[in-house]
Every structure is written in structure tokens, then in C-alpha cells.
Amino acid sequence: MTKPIVAIVGRPNVGKSTIFNRVVGERVSIVEDTPGVTRDRIYSSGEWLTHEFNIIDTGGIEIGDAPFQTQIRAQAEIAIDEADVIIFMVNVREGLTQSDEMVAQMLYKSKKPVVLAVNKVDNPEMRNDIFDFYSLGFGDPYPISGSHGLGLGDLLDEVVKHFDEETEDSYDEDTIRLSIIGRPNVGKSSLVNAILGEDRVIVSNVAGTTRDAVDTEYSYDGQDYVLIDTAGMRKKGKVYESTEKYSVLRALKAIERSNVVLIVIDAEEGIIEQDKRVAGYAHEEGKAVVIVVNKWDTVDKDSNTMKKFADDVRNQFQFLDYAQIAFVSAKEGTRLRTLFPYINEASENHKKRVQSSTLNEVVTDAISMNPTPTDKGRRLNVFYTTQVANEPPTFVVFVNDVELMHFSYKRYLENQIRHAFGFEGTPIHIIPRRRN
């Protein structure tokens, strides 16, 4: 399933970022950042009235010295391309402008749901000034105040009404769903073509030539797969040249639909910050991961080269210490078959469930080897551990006081559980909970 994307659009200086920060800071439950993951905060994942969604702030687009009209068009184009619901924001103090009307025309042609928000309605008397905005053709305008936080609940109530009911993909549960992600020009499309043995995706040495993603079913050695080629990691002409951070939005959709995520990095260029950002999305979604080092044919090698590169990957991607690393050349078609055992193992472990009795024996043994911590004379007591979910495997540890479960000890228990049950390729989550 994929979360709906809500985009806040409008001309500059109408308060988009203020409203985004209001929604993120006060009205939405934000997914906690993962240590070691670098991420631009132009989107957040949250929920409103039990509806989960991704919300993006187009106020941060950097176009450099491009004309004013190009900025407006860039914001609207991104929203049209990626959003499921659009919050179109205008400013009551400046009234209806020609730029507002231009944005409205673009959004109207998109045929996507648009909720009109009139910002800076800071007192009840100003509500009388919103009626001019009816002429934009998007129904009732919603008066809000970013500075005072007024009207946001009514606005979000209307937004979630436009969410489609989420449906599961129709693929068989034994089919492994793969998304292939990475920064532009690391060879994602070439990897897809090499796996499938045909040019299913346009490939060019210019970053961003991949078409819109199309699922492709594939079988190998008796296992069925669905490849989701994430065209979302592309750029689209001049409009996207300085907005690379927005290219993750479509990749997020593909990640959410996946069992296993292949994170592709360029062996020739090495690891850069954008690789970490891309990898962070998969990790935070709790997906099984395989790291694919592509273009391995371009690297001068000796007997230690692969180990040195793997060590560097481990150092740079410490939050993905569970992921296997495959070295391939999509262009030459070499070492591709080494991918599939890693993919299969990661998928199997992602779905794995373990018996509570055996699990508690492992935890008891772990505590005997490394006793629980104390704080101000109080010791953490672990009463019982149980698995409450899979995909990813999630465990609740019942304790006397959650505050006594230090991060380091939780990580220790995680490592012991991982080692005992063989959870290679998948994250596992441990949730301490106070026993009543």
C-alpha cells in the first residue's frame, strides 16, 4: 500500500512553509528520524484522523535566478506530477492575483483534488474577505491562519476526504516485490534491463531519462518477482535541475509497495550524501534491503578491493548493518545471479515469525551474559518478550520501566535476537512497554 501525497502549492509568500510547519509540528504525528540518516525536511510522514500520508512543502524549491513565473510553474508542475491531493494556498491580505489565477488554471487541468486554503485570516472580521476566491472554481475556500494555527483542523478534515481507499497489490503473497532505488545515473535502469534480459526501460548516460515506472513480473529459479523501476529518482528538464530532493516522492511510493528494496550505488563514484538520504527512506519504511554496488567492472581491483569497498559501505551505511552487499556490473551482465540469494533471504527474514518460548530463552540468555542496566539504584527488569508483527519483525519487550531501557541495551537485545534467529537483510524493531 502507498500513502497519499499531499502537496502545498501556491505563489511565493502566501505562507506555504508556515502552514507546513504548523501541520508537522502540532497536528501530525511525525515519524522519528533515524540516527545516521541525512534527510532534507521538505516532506514528512504523518497522520490525521487515522489517515497516514506524506505531506510536501513546495516552498523550499530553489530555482536560482530563474524568472518569477518559472518558480510558480515549477511548484505547480511538481504538485501535478506527484501529489494525490493538493492544498492550493492563497493570501487574503493581498487578495486574488493574476499569479493565483495562473496556478489555478494549471491545477484545474490536472483533474486532481484541490482544497483551497486562504491564509492569514487572523481574525473573524477577515472572513468576509475570502469570497473573491470562489471565482477560482475550487469550491469553498477554507480560511486559516498560519501564524495563529486557526482553521487547520477543518482544512485537514477536507483533505483526508479525498484520499482513495487503500488497496493491497493483487500480486500473490509469495511474489517478492522489488523496488530499485538510488540517485540519478547509478544504473538503476541498466540493472532492470540486465535482470530481464531486454530493454524494458530507456537507458541513457544522461541522468533522468527513465520513463514512468511500470511493474514488470519476472521469474527466476522458481521464484516470482515484481520489479518496480522507480522513475521517481529522475530529473525532468530545467524545472527539476535544482529540485533533486523532490525526486524522492515517487520512489517513496515504490518503496512502500515493496518487500525488498535494492539500493544501487555507483562503484566508480563511491558513496555520497545523496546515497545515504536515498537509503534512509527504505530503512525508515522498515523494508528489507540489499545494497547493490553497480559498475563494478569500472574499478581497478586486487584481492582486497571488494573487502575494502564493503568495509566503506558498512562505515557509511551504519544504519543498514543488516543489509547484504552485492557487487555487480549491469552493463557487462556480470555477477547478477549473486543478487537473488540475497533478495530471497531478505524477503524470507522480513516475513519471519519466531516462537515466543524460544524468543524468551534467547532474551534470558542475553540478559545473563550482559545484565540489564540500572539508573539511580533502579534496575531494568525484563518480564516477557513477544513478536507482535512481521514485515518487518517487531517485538514488544515488557519491562518494569520504559525509561530504564537505554538505547544501547535495546540495540544489544536487537543484535542478540538477530544473531539467534538469522534476521539478515531485514530491520527488526524492538518496542519496550511497561507491564501493567
Swiss-Prot record:
Residues involved in GTP 1 binding: 10-17, 57-61, 119-122
Residues reported in the UniProt entry to bind GTP 2: 182-189, 229-233, 294-297
GO biological process: ribosome biogenesis
Pfam families in alphabetical order: KH_dom-like, MMR_HSR1
GO molecular function, one term: GTP binding
Protein keywords: GTP-binding, Nucleotide-binding, Repeat, Ribosome biogenesis
Annotated SUPFAM superfamilies: P-loop containing nucleoside triphosphate hydrolases
Top-level taxon: Bacteria
Boundaries of every KH-like domain copy: 352-436
Function recorded in the entry: GTPase that plays an essential role in the late steps of ribosome biogenesis.
Protein name per Swiss-Prot or TrEMBL: GTPase Der
Organism in which the protein naturally occurs: Staphylococcus haemolyticus (strain JCSC1435)
Gene for this chain: der
